[in-house]
């Protein structure tokens, strides 16, 4: 467009040219970033699956008549995959199935792991000797937690310790003649050393009032790493066996973080451990030659080095299960190689030896699993085929009933808890079934699982009596709780010592503003004695813990640590429809909505003009005068 002189009607000013140049730079920069991102994505290591994606046989009961029938351990359709660099040998770990924790072995390249110990007890904390011939582990097969030795050639198991109390977490010396382990005695953990030949008395390595636990023996033989709270926080310490004086050295010195699970690299030059304090555990590695310079490798706990030191295997937890993953030990990129495992996956050890033959022999002794309980449901009642409620005999609760789909699971859990704890923990409940119109404590929601008949809440009076401890666990921005119940017998024959600091809800009422805002604080000291992990026990029978509600820091009941639900894969609405017709789930209106009535708005009325001219006339008011009061006559 031009003017009458043939010149452009609009000439761009300097600001317009600057704006156009800036816009062109933004467009070119965006294109360059897109090209660079595509090149970067093409060069990033892709996540690699473990040679098997076959799940370990689950311990969760289903709603069938035989809820825990054991599936085949080896999938018929699974095919071995080529192992990635640094993967060879055999992984040995503990995992929970059919209500018990036992040892499992996974040969790299096989489609699935195999169970190698069996029985109505728990086996865990496996450690393979340097020659791949024996496995040291902890077990409560005789009631108390002791150390045992499994001969892989003969399958023979012999006891290394037979003491009242607790021993666990063994680790081998490089020559295979000694085992270091943790023992709970006089109210705290200490590190001991035991000759495998049992020709000498155990040697006490640490003797400190604070907890010393989780030992790991240096492959070079002269150092033992362990976790200690002697400096206030939980740090990684190093014990030099050649220095009787000034033997212990704090390697981490992190007041704001806690560390655990130390593991030496095969050549002893690096140490892997776990850092806590970010809302999730982080696998960290650090060289031991000079000042500690740690590098985060990924999320997880219980790290184990591959035989060549190129890969770190670890356990990655979710609220209800675990899986084995691994990370490249040298490099910024992680390779996840996990297969899913149900619940409570424990300590991992990695040996360079192919233990296929002894593992197959041990796995051949496996027997058919006995179901933890049998489900017997009545025929659905009513026109909608809804499930009925069943009374819970001997249980005290406002409504001692549960859905017919889960009542057998609860009764079996109650009986198991009685055996494990030595007292009837589930005989009294705060809630079992809650009617659709029954009020719940402040902080709980209308869509609570207690309304479904599939959930229960144990009595909080046990918490007030000091028989319950809860440990906070965060997953993906949600807060969960692990519940520990104190055993009736405190001689070590029931339960085990606590290893983590429980949460103190009462701290928010003690005048600390930070504790009030956070809904409490961790207890400074771990309570003494022996406890049973009730969260794990409930999961054996299909009862899951629930996440805390967003209001839990304000409302105590919103923490929901005492509520457990048997979902059977159902969401809340589907579970409610097992008991109620759809019309009953419409949110009720608590009162009739008022209908607004229109009201006339009064308008000001003008004052007549003649009233505006009237001036008020003052009215005289007589002023009272004082009078003289005559004096009385004498």
Residue positions per predicted region:
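Sequence signature of WD/YWTD-type beta-propeller architectures
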Residues: 2-7, 12-376, 628-632
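Acidic helix-start/capping segments at beta-turn-to-alpha-helix junctions
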Residues: 422-444, 551-558
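Extracellular/periplasmic catalytic domains that process cell-envelope and extracellular macromolecules
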Residues: 85, 447-453, 555-557
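Structural recognition of the beta-strand scaffold that forms the well-ordered cores
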Residues: 425-428, 455-460, 545-548, 562-563
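Short, surface-exposed glycine/acidic/tryptophan-bearing loops
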Residues: 438-459
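Second-shell loop/turn segments in exported
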Residues: 392-404, 443-445, 515-527
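Active-site acidic/histidine clusters and adjacent loop/turn architecture
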Residues: 350-430
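Catalytic cores and adjacent binding grooves of peptidoglycan-active enzymes
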Residues: 464-594
């Amino acid at each position: 467009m031009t003017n009458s002189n043939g010149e452009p009607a609009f000439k761009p000013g300097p600001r317009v040219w600057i704006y156009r140049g800036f816009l062109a730079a933004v467009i070119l920069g965006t294109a360059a970033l897109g090209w660079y991102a595509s090149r970067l994505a093409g060069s990033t290591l892709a996540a690699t699956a473990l040679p098997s994606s076959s799940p370990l046989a689950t311990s969760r009961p289903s709603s069938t008549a035989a809820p825990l029938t054991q599936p085949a351990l080896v999938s018929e359709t699974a095919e071995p995959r080529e192992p990635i660099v640094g993967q060879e040998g055999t992984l040995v770990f503990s995992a929970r199935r059919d209500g018990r924790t036992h040892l499992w072995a996974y040969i790299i390249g096989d489609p699935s792991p195999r169970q190698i110990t069996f029985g109505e007890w728990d086996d865990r904390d496996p450690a393979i000797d340097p020659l791949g011939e024996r496995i040291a582990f902890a077990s409560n097969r005789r009631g108390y937690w002791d150390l045992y030795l499994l001969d892989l050639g003969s399958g023979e198991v012999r006891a290394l310790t037979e003491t009242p109390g607790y021993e666990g977490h063994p680790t081998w010396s490089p020559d295979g003649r000694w085992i270091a382990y943790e023992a709970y005695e006089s109210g705290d953990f200490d590190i001991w050393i035991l000759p495998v030949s049992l020709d000498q008395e155990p040697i006490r390595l640490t003797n400190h009032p604070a907890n010393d636990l989780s030992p790991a023996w240096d492959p070079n033989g002269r150092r033992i790493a362990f976790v200690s709270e002697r400096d206030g926080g939980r740090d990684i310490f190093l014990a030099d066996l050649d220095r009787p004086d000034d033997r212990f050295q704090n390697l981490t010195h992190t007041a704001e973080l806690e560390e655990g699970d130390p593991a030496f690299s095969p050549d002893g030059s690096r140490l892997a451990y776990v850092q806590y304090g970010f809302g999730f555990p982080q696998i960290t590695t650090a060289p031991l030659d000079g000042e500690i310079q740690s590098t985060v490798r990924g999320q997880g706990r219980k790290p184990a080095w591959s035989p060549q030191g190129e890969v770190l295997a670890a356990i990655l937890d979710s609220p209800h299960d675990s899986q084995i993953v691994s990370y490249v030990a040298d490099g910024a990129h992680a390779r996840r190689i996990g297969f899913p495992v149900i619940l409570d996956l424990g300590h991992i050890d990695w040996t360079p030896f192919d233990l296929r033959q002894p593992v197959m022999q041990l796995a051949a002794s496996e027997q058919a699993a006995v179901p933890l309980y049998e489900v017997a449901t009545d025929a659905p009642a009513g026109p909608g085929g809804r499930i009925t409620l069943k009374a819970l005999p001997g249980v005290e609760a406002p409504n001692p009933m549960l859905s017919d789909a889960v009542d057998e699971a609860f009764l079996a859990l109650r009986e198991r808890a009685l055996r494990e704890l030595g007292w009837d923990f589930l005989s009294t409940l705060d809630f079992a079934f809650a009617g659709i119109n029954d009020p719940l404590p402040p902080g709980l929601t209308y869509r609570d699982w207690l309304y479904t008949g599939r959930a229960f809440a144990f009595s909080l009076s046990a918490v007030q009596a000091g028989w319950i401890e809860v440990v906070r666990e965060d997953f993906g921005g949600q807060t969960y709780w692990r519940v520990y119940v104190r055993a009736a017998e405190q001689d070590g024959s029931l339960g085990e010592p606590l290893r983590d600091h429980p949460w103190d809800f009462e701290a928010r009422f003690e005048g600390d503003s930070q504790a009030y805002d956070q809904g409490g604080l961790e207890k400074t000291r771990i309570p003494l004695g022996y406890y049973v992990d009730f969260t794990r026990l409930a999961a054996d029978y299909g009862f899951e813990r629930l996440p805390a509600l967003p209001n839990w820091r304000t409302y105590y009941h919103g923490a929901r640590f005492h509520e457990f639900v048997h979902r059977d894969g159902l969401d809340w609405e589907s579970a409610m429809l097992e008991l109620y017709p759809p019309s009953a789930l419409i949110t009720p209106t608590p009162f009739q909505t008022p209908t607004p009535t229109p009201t006339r708005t009064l308008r000001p009325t003008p004052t007549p003009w003649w009233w505006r001219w009237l001036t008020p006339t003052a009215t005289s008011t007589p002023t009272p005068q004082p009078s003289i009061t005559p004096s009385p006559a004498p």
